[in-house]
A protein has these predicted regions:
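Ligand-binding pockets and gating/stacking loops
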Residues: 1-257
Length: 257
């Protein structure tokens, strides 16, 4: 039995290595001009590939090109059939989206990292006729407030001291988690193009003031676009587990094409 199991494992590994999905992971097969379109302006594809192939941690330090290569890989995988793909900018303490100082400058840099790759992914999938059956969701787990952390006259560890007159970008912290509003982008998958749903206040605290969306409704909208009932549940130990919270999610029909 153990020998048969081992042989089956080798057979499965051989099939996987020779499958279209395995070839999709080989980004060296992609024309250089295509790779460039997925990278921020000025980022050298050769340098990014060299970092990816190194063993000295260079790729872990490479930030500008990683998300772009992830989007390129996502497009290649969409062409061969995987049903669920995740691309992330990754969590690195006090870096990237963890904006504990220079928040507005950091946000501008992060937008530079994700802007071209996301746009090119959408364009490529549309050109290949894959966008109408692919739902692209760009989201984060929470928003940030636009002021520095802490309360007046209360000390916060390693807090940037903010003068009465702000003259330096580092004083814009964008520290605090903010749950009263946020933004999610949806592309393809049966959703409208160029459509804006909801509105936030013009002044702080910039809460949602029109068409608020609860997380279970966002999930229901995504499932509905994919042809899955938001009330679908699976029974585990005689208890129903719903794909949306308690099966209460309702699709936002206004965003559907």
């Amino acid at each position: 039995y153990q020998r048969e199991s081992l042989i089956r494992s080798f057979d499965n590994a051989h099939r996987l290595l020779n499958s279209p999905a395995a070839k999709a992971f080989d980004l060296s097969l992609e024309p250089v001009e295509n790779v460039k379109r997925y990278l921020p302006a000025g980022v050298d594809p050769a340098r990014t590939f060299q970092a990816a192939q190194s063993r000295d941690g260079a790729y872990e330090r490479e930030t500008l090109g990683r998300f772009g290569l992830g989007c390129l890989l996502a497009r290649r995988l969409c062409e061969v059939g995987p049903r669920y793909i995740v691309v992330t900018t990754e969590y690195i303490p006090f870096l990237n989206w963890d904006t504990h100082e220079n928040g507005h400058t950091r946000a501008a840099d992060m937008k530079r990292q994700i802007d071209a790759p996301i746009a090119q992914l959408v364009l490529d999938l549309e050109e290949r006729g894959l966008l109408n059956r692919t739902l692209i969701v760009v989201a984060s787990e929470f928003s940030r407030d636009m002021i520095t952390e802490g309360k007046p006259e209360k000390t916060v560890k390693d807090q940037v001291e903010v003068p009465e007159k702000i003259e330096d970008l580092k004083h814009y912290g964008m520290h605090r988690h903010f749950t009263d509003a946020g933004s999610v982008l949806l592309f393809g998958g049966g959703v409208k193009k160029g459509f804006l749903y909801g509105r936030t206040a013009e002044e702080r605290p910039v809460k949602t003031i029109e068409n608020p969306v609860h997380i279970e409704d966002l999930h229901a909208t995504m499932y509905s676009a994919l042809g899955i009932s938001p009330k679908l549940s699976y029974e585990i130990e005689r208890r129903p587990f719903y794909v949306t919270r308690d099966g209460l999610g309702k699709p936002i029909r206004d965003v559907m094409a």
